Amino acid sequence: GLATCMLILLYVRDELSYDRYNTNADRICRVNNEIRFGDNYFDLAVTPALQGSAMVREMPQVQQYARLRWHGSIFVRKGNENIREGRVGYADSSLFDVFTLPMIEGDPRTALKEYHSLVVTETIAKKYFNSTDVVGKTMLVNDTGNYKITGVIKDIPKQSHFNFDFFVPMMENEGANDDNWLSENWNTYVLLRKNTDVKQVEAQLNPLMNRHIGPQLQSIVNKSLDDFEKSGGYIRASLTPLTAIHLHSNKTAELDANGNIQFVYIFSAIALLILLIACVNFMNLSTARSSNRSKEVGVRKVLGSLRKNLVQQFLTELFLVSVFALVVAIVSAWLLLPSFNQLSGKDIHPATLFQPKMIISLLALMFIVGLLAGSYPAFFLSSFQPVDVLKGKLAGGFKRSWLRNSLVVVQFVISIVLIFGTIVIYRQLSYIHSKDLGFNRSQVLTINHTDMLGDRAITFRNELLQISGVRNATMSCFTPVNFARNNNTYFTSTALNPATGIGMQSWTVDENYIPALGMKILQGRNFSTQFASDSTGIIINEAAAKFLASKDLLNKKLYTPRDLHSKDIDEYHIIGVIKNFNFSSLRDVVTPLALFFGKSNGNISVQINSANIPDVIARIKDKWKTIAPSQAFDYSFMDDDFNKLYTTEQRTGQIFITFAVLAILIASLGLFGLITYAAEQRVKEVGIRKVLGASLRNIAGMLSKDFLKLVLIASFIAFPVAW
């Protein structure tokens, strides 16, 4: 029980320590935007490109700002090999002013101020150069250009809500200075001045937003900000303290999958329940065997020992047992930690067990356990009267001990509730794997970075279709399991009335996309190269169709402004409606989506129809090497990519199930011990009953019926609680 509690304590401690490595963690906040546009609602962890700089300029409480944004994977040349690196981000040069990222080599004031430069972590520097003294050296990226290394930082701690290995200067992103305040794509962080009240800063955020958004809203949709808000729309900004992001933020466009404070509460509760069950076991077994020490107590009292002396003696004995249990628990936790890290996805070092704060926590835990588990047995044993001992009135049975029976009931109430919780979690995990997502992800291979092929991408796709075992192949900018997204707003008339605006995911795909991914067309038709008009055709999902609420959706027109600085409006017509499919978390409702017909070659998804998948992959790779011999062949399976979206949920569920099973096992061991002792106390009775012809079933029923009654009582209490 103690070892299990230690592991949970390490997990909870790790979760609560996120981002606290930053020296100014209490002064750093992330800026969020919340948008209501017609019937569309977005809760975003991102902002317009210029919001951070405007806050520094117009709000004296804001000392500095820094932006981060995912760059996407790159290929780095090492010898003759191109190695894929996935954790690459754009960052402002002020990154090192806001966050505590110690630089080993280079100057943090200039490190991210050069085009075609990189700041890398210590691990990356050693991986490619076997040294951290690499400032000034270059890395060949994507076989297209050399990037100069301008800084090497220490590895970012695991307890960070972002964890990049490469930082690219923000100036390399063409949208870094975009003055469109209606486009949110940037994770923006601000460093507040000392003794600044976050609430006061938040109160000034919306007036700042309105000053910049109002004129642009008027320009784009010819509506004032007041009219926009009267129609029910709004754009609001807020701040999230840095240390609250990991456990308290679940917004759209988070930099990485966050945790959940509810899980911390749940695991803490499980730790307490396991500790309680273990203490109850100890108390029950100690008092059950009390008759073994009754004569000792009687003799000591006859010789003049006071009750307080006996209580002190028994408490001392029990505390020594607690000390021994703590030592065994520490050794057990040490040995189990690698397996626990693998289960939880953590990287907790065994030395953590011996950090000062941890040692204090463990000593406090030992004291509480010793006091909780030892008090009742100590007072119970010291209450024996010499006369009762001599007369043999003390019994080790269970019917007379209402407190012991109550503790058994408590144990099994906890165990039954945990059993129900385990079943629910297991079914949730099964639901994730078996849910009909509205698209086929089985045996679909996604080839990444096909945009590097340029015009050769179509040729490559067509050659893949000639391979035996390939049923279909499609080019697109997004797949349903991508983290990246592209949102745009469309209107039902050229008046661009905000009240009729609909925010939709906008994905460019080819004519094979819908059949290759097994999507179902409910109305209309698929894209076709036979219709020139399909260049402005779109296919929407059910969620978009429901918003439009039109009986005749086919050929209905939708409009969107071409860009912020133009009065031009792009017109599209609906040619089909597809069944909703999940392209975000299963916790979220499916939002409106539109597919556009075009040449987007970000990736190619291949539907495989063969039992010999390795052979098909080998032939696909051969085709790739023929077309792009110098480019790395990078692929993944769509079902694996889908599972990665739910890694946090799956790990959390597995941890819960593991600890719940341990709690149930500990409770069962305690009950087994009590039943075994009860059998020992009734050996003579069992012998007599056997002589008189009692069967094994009769004897088993006799020994277990009292406990079965307790389990039944526990069930009546636990079922409503679990429900």
State each model region's role.
Residues 1-11, 259-295, 322-323, 327, ...:
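Hydrophobic alpha-helical transmembrane segments of multi-pass inner-membrane transport and secretion
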Residues 8, 15, 31, 55, ...:
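Generic structural signal for small/hydrophobic residues in well-ordered secondary structure
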Residues 22, 211-271, 291-294, 334-364, ...:
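Membrane-helix entry/capping segments
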Residues 252-256, 286-323, 327, 331-454:
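Alpha-helical transmembrane segments of integral membrane proteins
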Residues 299-337, 663, 684-723:
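Transmembrane alpha-helical interface segments in multi-pass membrane proteins
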